[in-house]
């Protein structure tokens, strides 16, 4: 495995995704927590501006930021279909976002992925949905990059896979003395991409457009 970030935490495996959730999402407790946050900030929670804030925040987090916890990446990708093609398949600029667990701020950007088929092809929408399943969690950009590449090999039966993510990290962009245009790039190569410099070069050239 050739990745820009290798996590040596023993609980991290190719089959696990994001910070592990130990219980189901509790909508009521989440809304109460948002109200407590507003009150702790000195803001009234029952005004025309904030009366529905807790509900709106909960819906956003449950449906868009953390919905990956309710999606199995393997099921999202599906089984694909049989095809003898073995040439590289590349998809550029798939929207991706997740939530950094350090500051509870999102990161957002684009994922470029490629895989080398080994008898099966996969729908492009399915691949994008798999990325949602992996990234819409409390997680790190480095983990998402690693897990997407591994999932294409493990679940997609590919000979090799590549993933490169370029994203804005709000915890970085909102830090002191920042210019506001910082981007983080992470990449991971698995299987035949690991040793095949030509394949990696072809992938990187293609995503530059």
Swiss-Prot record:
Transmembrane segments: none annotated. It comes from the Bacteria. It comes from Ralstonia nicotianae (strain ATCC BAA-1114 / GMI1000) (Ralstonia solanacearum). This is GTP cyclohydrolase 1. One of its GO terms (biological process) is tetrahydrofolate biosynthetic process. The gene is folE. Zn(2+) binds at residues 100, 103, 171. It is an enzyme of class 3 (hydrolase). Toroid-shaped homodecamer, composed of two pentamers of five dimers. The keyword Metal-binding applies. One of its GO terms (molecular function) is GTP binding. Belongs to the GTP cyclohydrolase I family. It catalyses: GTP + H2O = 7,8-dihydroneopterin 3'-triphosphate + formate + H(+). The keyword RNA-binding does not apply. NCBIfam families: PRK09347.1-2, PRK09347.1-3. Its EC number is 3.5.4.16. It holds the Pfam family GTP_cyclohydroI.
């Amino acid at each position: 495995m050739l990745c820009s970030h290798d996590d040596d935490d023993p609980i991290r495996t190719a089959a696990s995704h994001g910070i592990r959730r130990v219980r189901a999402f509790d909508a009521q407790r989440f809304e109460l927590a948002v109200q407590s946050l507003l009150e702790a900030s000195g803001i009234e929670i029952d005004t025309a501006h904030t009366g529905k804030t807790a509900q709106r925040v909960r819906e956003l987090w449950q449906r868009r930021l953390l919905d990956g916890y309710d999606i199995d990446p393997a099921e999202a990708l599906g089984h694909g279909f049989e095809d003898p093609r073995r040439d590289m398949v590349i998809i550029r600029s798939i929207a991706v976002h997740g939530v950094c667990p350090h500051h509870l701020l999102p990161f957002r950007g684009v994922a470029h992925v490629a895989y080398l088929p080994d008898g099966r092809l996969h729908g492009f929408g399915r691949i994008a949905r798999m990325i949602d399943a992996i990234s819409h969690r409390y997680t790190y950009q480095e983990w998402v990059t690693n897990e997407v590449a591994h999932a294409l090999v493990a679940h997609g039966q590919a000979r090799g896979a590549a993933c490169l993510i370029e994203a804005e990290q709000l915890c970085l962009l909102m830090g002191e003395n920042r210019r506001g245009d910082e981007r983080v790039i992470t990449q991971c190569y698995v299987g035949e991409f690991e040793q095949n410099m030509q394949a990696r070069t072809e992938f990187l050239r293609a995503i530059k457009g």
